[in-house]
């Protein structure tokens, strides 16, 4: 998993560890087990442990919304992107679009750096940079995701919920509920 040393540039290690968790979850691991494993393997400062936890759980919780952003910002739909790239972009987009205290430059630069040093992703570092900078421009312009026409799909995308759940919710509460 993580090949970074503890002397890696500031902020890179927590983001790498969160990315490792996302990849493990995509491969079938339970999020809490994957997170506990990466945190146990490193002696991190409490602030770094908190950042790893927030990035991993946040990106997992917001996966559908982050995929919708990738579909909007990228040339290739999220589902067709290489998984490692997709999860790295989720870490970057989560910081840019859903966290308030992370400097934009830190979110973009660390994601690009992680792509550069990752086997198989180095050539895609410009893609990471381009997608994240497009997200910044979109955010600064006040643009939001276009929502689908039907209410269950709107709720699912806006709140990163499964379709079956929002369909049941609308059936239970009605379209006006």
Question: For the regions a protein language model found, what residue spans apply to each?
Answer:
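Class I Rossmann-like S-adenosyl-L-methionine
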Residues: 1-177
């Amino acid at each position: 998993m993580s090949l970074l040393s503890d002397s890696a540039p500031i902020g890179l290690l927590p983001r790498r560890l969160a990315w490792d968790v996302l990849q493990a979850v995509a491969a079938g691991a339970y999020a809490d087990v994957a997170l506990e494993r990466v945190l146990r393997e490193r002696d991190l400062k409490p602030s770094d442990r908190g950042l790893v936890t927030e990035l991993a759980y946040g990106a997992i919780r917001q996966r559908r919304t982050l995929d919708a952003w990738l579909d909007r910002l990228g040339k290739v739909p999220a589902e067709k992107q290489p998984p490692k790239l997709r999860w790295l972009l989720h870490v970057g987009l989560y910081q840019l679009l859903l966290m308030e205290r992370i400097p934009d430059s830190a979110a973009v630069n660390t994601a690009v750096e992680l792509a550069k040093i990752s086997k198989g992703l180095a050539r895609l570092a410009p893609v990471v940079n381009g997608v994240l900078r497009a997200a910044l421009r979109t955010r600064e312009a006040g643009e939001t995701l276009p929502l689908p026409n039907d209410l269950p799909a709107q709720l699912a995308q806006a709140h990163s919920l499964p379709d079956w759940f929002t369909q049941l919710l609308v059936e239970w509460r009605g379209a006006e509920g």
